[in-house]
Swiss-Prot record:
It is found in: Cytoplasm. Its EC number is 6.1.1.21. The gene is hisS. Its main location: cytoplasm. This is Histidine--tRNA ligase. Homodimer. Residues 434-454 are annotated as: Disordered.
Amino acid sequence: MARLKPLSGFPEFLPSGQMVENHVTRILEETFELHGFAPIRTRAVEPMEQLTRKGEIDKEVYVVDRLHADPHDTRSGKDRLGLHFDLTVPFARYVLENAGHLYFPFRRYQIQKVWRGERPQEGRYREFTQADIDIVGDQTLAEHHDVETPLVMLSALERLHTELGFPTVTMHVNNRKLSEGFYRGLGIADPMAVLQRVDKYDKIGPDAVRKLLVDELNLSDDAAAKCVALASIQSTDDSFIAKVRELGVANDMLEEGLDSLNRVVAAVNKAVPGRMVANLKIARGLDYYTGTVYETELTGHESMGSVCSGGRYESLASDGKHVYPGVGISLGLTRLLAPILSRGELSSSRSVPSAVLVAVNTEEDRATSEVIASALRSRGIPCEVAPKADKFGKQIKHADRRGIPFVWFPGVKHADYRDADTVKDIRSGDQVEADAGAWNPPTEDLHPGVIGTW
């Protein structure tokens, strides 16, 4: 058989890495549920008509079809199915289909795989897991949710920092109305074209962006310079407002965006000082978000790009009679974890869940070991029974190779009694008598821990 090669862009973790992901997922789920977000799971496929509404994603959609499809199938392209490339499209459909059974504002979290047929590279995958939170209203959605949503995600990321040693994060925020109003105030008829060039600011620099605006969009030197100047503005307080006004552009939409952005930044930084930065060069997503837009970077690992982004949709979903506005944030879980795990910067303290290996005296006495294991499991202690009744030295070596910290030795059976059981910490060599109905491992050994080497 030919040697198997891994498929690029479809990351798979060894058990120790998967346990790290599971641990991170539990933290996210606990945090989201503490804030009242309900879990949902949507199907993997959606009609192509829905998936291709975002034109720029067309080439990245995986189409689903049967290998031996009916050659006479006359379905049009819109009736074909594809794998979802994010969780927003299926969520919008879910809201429309279940609106009569949901109570609004509806708060949901969703941790699920998505698929994109893009060229694999570090930080970009063809199959990956996202963790999304959204709050959706019926007809209206109060602005305070633009504050609440990032605070919930920041709370989850702070737990990853304090409990697992993840770097701290900074959330950058802009507002679609601010940027669009500024460009319209300059007399620019196509603000989206400007946003597409400004989106390259970090990659090519301000001078190159200015040149693109002049050469490709025929902006005047003065207008191009002001667009670049706007993109350079950042602050954690309201000083960004004065800096924008110094550029001398007047527009009602601009003022609305400034006020809204200021309220969001002030409220978030009051709760978690310094975690949110008004960053007016954020352009990605402003072509479909209608208000606030977020991007999040790991401190000291900015080269990874945004690991968490989102924003407000004034029309997340609509059935013609009802409009459902929403605000949400998506954490790229695989994008966050895969590079870290591959570099060994985060790992599990052991590669198996078991805290105890129950040794087997003889194969004839295996039932005794199984009874002990059942007693331990009934009290929430993960354990497994040795696969063979080898010499105890070999059974200890088996536990050591699997990273299991304790070995349980059943007492030897005699004609009318059985010796006391003992349990050994194979790291220290300490061995004590123990009762499976009462003994507990140290709390830190009960479940695998996560070790960071950042």
